[in-house]
Amino acid sequence: MKALVKAKREEGIWMQHDVPVPEVGVHDVMIRVTKSAICGTDVHIYNWDEWSQKTVPVPMVVGHEYVGRVERVGAEVEAFRPGERVSGEGHVTCGFCRNCRAGRRHLCRHTVGVGVNRPGSFAEYVVIPADNVYRIPDDIPDDIAAIFDPFGNATHTALSFDLVGEDVLVTGAGPIGVMAAAIARHVGARHVVVTDVNDYRLDLARRMGASRAVNVAREDLRAVMSELGMREGFDVGLEMSGNGRAFRQLLEVMNHGGRIALLGIMPGPEPIDWSQVVFKGLQLKGVYGREMYETWYKMVAMLQSGLDLSAVVTHRFSIDDFQQGFDVMRSGRSGKVVLDWGVAR
């Protein structure tokens, strides 16, 4: 089959046409991929940075954001049938550790990542356990279904705390950050402010419903808060940037008793003024992946109740033009990039 493969221990990803079709175990589902999306993780793997070198075995079929149709099911699978439109949870868990048995599969200490530690979805076919397959309702477009993985990250992070009537600061205007901003507005936050230094992505944040999108390289965040009539600090912080300076500013403008969910990963140790956390009584929560499968349920429910994410998909290419897609993603001047496998729905 045709697939995008991390075939060499160097920068780049390569199209190969002779990749073996993955085998289907008795509890597995084979999905024929119709559309894929490029994730920031895929860019890290493309760049072959320090994290990728330590994490990804080579060769590896990459990719974990997709939508497709069930092609084949294992002998013990009864919940799905060929032809159904589906996506899939990209974290394969053990099912036996304490967290898995308690229904907290997103905290499994033995998680294996699709497209990172096992063959992924930048391929004509991907095989995952049936437990990881999620059926897509007919009223959700393919382009949106293809980005359920990062949409799930945004949902898990944004819905970590009650947002109704709250003032929310999102640090980082990447695709996940702007989707989190849209979610916050959808569920009833009062002011949703997004910060970044990338004007392209700040404009995208405005289109996604942010009250204000602030370039902190040249704008005063506290002045913006004053203009919005905020007399105290932010009630909820969503840290999406993985930038130490952004996180420190977030701590400075949080209200006492504020709550912070952290999804962004800082590249190394960062000096933090912990007195901001202690004396303000802040709550910090690390977020990884999606809650299985409550996050997925809420994603569908929000889309069906009017959440509009269409603006976040900014570029579309044929899979044969994947290099253009990666170039756009690496430029920083894009939202989500979707690759079409040319398969009829």
Curated annotation (Swiss-Prot):
It catalyses: L-threonine + NAD(+) = (2S)-2-amino-3-oxobutanoate + NADH + H(+). Zn(2+) 1 binds at C39, H64, E65. Coiled coil: none annotated. The active site is at T41, H44. Its cofactor is Zn(2+). It is found in: Cytoplasm. Transmembrane segments: none annotated. Its main location: cytoplasm. Binds 2 Zn(2+) ions per subunit. The keyword Lyase does not apply. InterPro entries: ADH-like_C, ADH-like_N, ADH_Zn_CS, GroES-like_sf, L-Threonine_3-DHase, NAD(P)-bd_dom_sf, PKS_ER, Zn_alcohol_dh. It comes from the Bacteria. The record marks D149 as: Important for catalytic activity for the proton relay mechanism but does not participate directly in the coordination of zinc atom. Its EC number is 1.1.1.103. Zn(2+) 2 binds at C94, C97, C100, C108. Keywords: Cytoplasm, Metal-binding, NAD, Oxidoreductase, Zinc. GO terms for cellular component: cytoplasm. GO terms for molecular function: L-threonine 3-dehydrogenase activity; zinc ion binding. NCBIfam families: PRK05396.1, tdh. Belongs to the zinc-containing alcohol dehydrogenase family. Catalyzes the NAD(+)-dependent oxidation of L-threonine to 2-amino-3-ketobutyrate. This is L-threonine 3-dehydrogenase. It comes from Anaeromyxobacter dehalogenans (strain 2CP-C). The gene is tdh.
